[in-house]
Amino acid sequence: MCIRDSILGATKLHDFDGITPTVANIRPTSRGEINIVSNNIKDYPKIKMNYLSTDDDRYVAAQGLKLVRKIMLETETFKKYEPEEYRPGLHIKDDEEVVKAGSDHTQTIFHPVGTCKMGKDENSVVDDKLKVHGIENLRVVDASIMPSITSGNTNAPTIMIAEKAADMILGK
């Protein structure tokens, strides 16, 4: 399948067929930041993703990428297709080099959580009733209050948070 240039400015990556296996760390230990930079609602917040910033996450990434190589290049299922590694390239072998090459293409899997800490300390955003500290009549009712991501899709736990919030708001 080829994406037309007119769609989001996409261009064809190369002139050969291929597949893109991916590695997804579903229990990352790296933590990013979202900071409000002004009181103007039109100013975007400052977002620092901080992907692969811990030793654990770099280890998982390196081992995952090595496993993908092994599956793609050494299993009978794929060997018959004579696969060649396009990126990062077989010349990159050291764990840190593999992670560096992978980090150039690291991105979210669109399930951000944990951006609005619950608690009573100065770094928390909401209390145990999901009310935002210092602001009346505002609650956070989504995955951002989760302390860490679930191993599966975040949809069901987020629905549970919303159901609990509805009960709290209704005084049940």
Language-model features and meaning:
Residues 4-157, 165-172:
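FAD-dependent oxidoreductase catalytic-site/capping-region signature
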